[in-house]
Amino acid sequence: MAGRINDEDVKAVRDAVPIDAVVSEYLQLRNAGGGNLKGLCPFHDEKSPSFQVSPSKGFFHCFGCQEGGDTITFVMKIDHLTFSEAVERLAGQAGITLRYEEGGYNPSHQRGERIRLVEAHKIAAQWYAEQLATGPEADTGRAFLADRGFDQAAAEHFGVGYSPQGWDHLTRFLRGKGFSDKELLLSGLSQEGRRGPIDRFRGRLMWPIRDIGGDVVGFGARKLYEADNGPKYLNTPDTAIYKKSQVLYGIDLAKKDIAKASRAVVVEGYTDVMACHLAGVTTAIATCGTAFGGDHIKILRRLLMDNGSARVIFTFDGDAAGQKAALRAFEDDQKFAAETYIAIAPDGMDPCDLRLAKGDDAVADLVEPRTPLFEFALRQIVARYDLDTPAGRAAALDEAAPVVARIKNSGAQHEVAVQLAGMLGILDTQFVVKRIAQLARWARDRGGKGPAPDQRQRGGGPQQQAGPMTATPRGPALNLRNPVFATERELLKLALQRPELVSPAFDAYGVDEFTAPPYAAVREAIMEAGGAEFGVQDPQDYLVRVREAAPDDTVRAMVTELAVEAIMLHRGVKGVDEVYAGAQLVTVRRRAVERRIRDITGRLTRLSGHGDPAELAAVQNELWILQQYDQNLREHGAAAL
């Protein structure tokens, strides 16, 4: 059993790896104000960014699904790692050597399964690349690449390799690196043979497939020899780290340019990705042995941000198979907020052939004059009918109308319906528009998938005022229109985000001064962590301690939410300063004092008739002291605390 990672080393990892640098490897982040960043949440499907990152605090929080935590938590959740595995990965990125307690630690045998499988793929990718670069048997592979316009430098840039024809070359090599037969079989790099594991890929050109974080998780392999009875392309089977429906070839190279340009180009094959990138179209990606689908859309959506100017361009062969691929993509188009287009070379060549025949400029030009995908799909349908006859036009409308009816936005649906009428040559445009609208209503009445028109974005990102009021599946339901709750929330945000503005006064506040139970729990967690005063001394460790002191996941999520959420400034307030913080401190304290005054007044009423004179005098004195304190707070503000 692996030893426990030293606490100081865990803290060093948190401090060394900026959370925004880690998160931006998986999604596009933009300025959210107040020093925070925002993006589309990778943990649930959304169209408006409700996921926020606070680089200064080292925390993230989603106001939609309530996921939150620090850098380590993010890596654990997004890559399905244990705590130790996530720390080990981040430590490797930061160059930190970890120390382990409770006995020795043998990395080659005791690391988590995912990390072991990723390590096996990393070593395999390096080995395959070496075989292609120097192995005499790899002449066939090098010739294949050269015939398609790729030199050694291109092969190295994309990590292309070669798997020798023998039965178990890689298997024996990885065994020598300390990997067990079980690990090799689980990784998909080896498969069961008659006498034990053998190489899955033999005599093939190898493309490493990386996840969005850059880890090699699988391979695509192209047949090179006629004697090979296997398929032309062979991919890694689904494993613990590789799901073909959830990976895109080239995403590790293209992600930054996709986010920067708000454009993604989807091609069909590995060589097409290579050709596009070498021609300057560095936003090109491809699926890996499967059709483009919903999980691929989620990956791109996080990078494109659905900001209205995003473009997704599909390039397919001009043959029937390519056209079917385009129409399949259209089935999922409703999940895209980005506008989707298709580009097909006039002569039907794919980007790889186009680059070879006409050069880099032709590839770059391919993705410029593009056709909206819905228009392409409709033209494919319409082309099958004789539009010179009324029967042909009616039949084409019958098939095309349901496609247009699936467009959820009513304005876009109307516009496309008008275009369809023009394609069909039907002069009565309103007839086509009404027919499609009727089909859309029928689909909704039958409980069809998708939201009603113009209701695609009911949930949204956190606004400074409305965001915290959003109902959450796990967090406590609070009516923040209640000014008491709202002020308590702001004071806790200050205590977590700007402790220097409220310390030491805040640490004298009792848990009972917070009337909302979850806020009282957060106040108690802050107290258990050493108070706001500790936050002044060590801001990073302070938030970690507060989260650890939380009694359950609900309170822990609330701590993260309050640490990330922007501080809400009232009208006329220019910034977060001591004056603003003092006002929140005074408001919360005065409300607590007023509640106590009401309680004592009621007690005094009960004692007035037949109470003990000494007790009555004591209660009257307490009431007078509280009234004087309340007056001082009203007249002198924070100075009276």
Swiss-Prot record:
SMART domains in the cross-refs: DnaG_DnaB_bind (SM00766), TOPRIM (SM00493), ZnF_CHCC (SM00400)
Quaternary organization: Monomer. Interacts with DnaB.
Cofactor binding note from Swiss-Prot or TrEMBL: Binds 1 zinc ion per monomer.
Sequence positions that bind Mg(2+) 1: E268, D317
Annotated domain remarks: Contains an N-terminal zinc-binding domain, a central core domain that contains the primase activity, and a C-terminal DnaB-binding domain.
Span list, region Disordered: 444-478
Enzymatic class: transferase
Keywords for the protein's UniProt record, in alphabetical order: DNA replication, DNA-binding, DNA-directed RNA polymerase, Magnesium, Metal-binding, Nucleotidyltransferase, Primosome, Transcription, Transferase, Zinc, Zinc-finger
E.C. designation(s): 2.7.7.101
GO terms for cellular component: cytoplasm; DNA-directed RNA polymerase complex; primosome complex
Claim: Zinc is one of the keywords in the record: yes
Role this protein plays: RNA polymerase that catalyzes the synthesis of short RNA molecules used as primers for DNA polymerase during DNA replication.
Gene3D superfamilies, alphabetized: 3.40.1360.10, DNA primase, catalytic core, N-terminal domain, Zinc finger, CHC2-type domain
Protein name: DNA primase
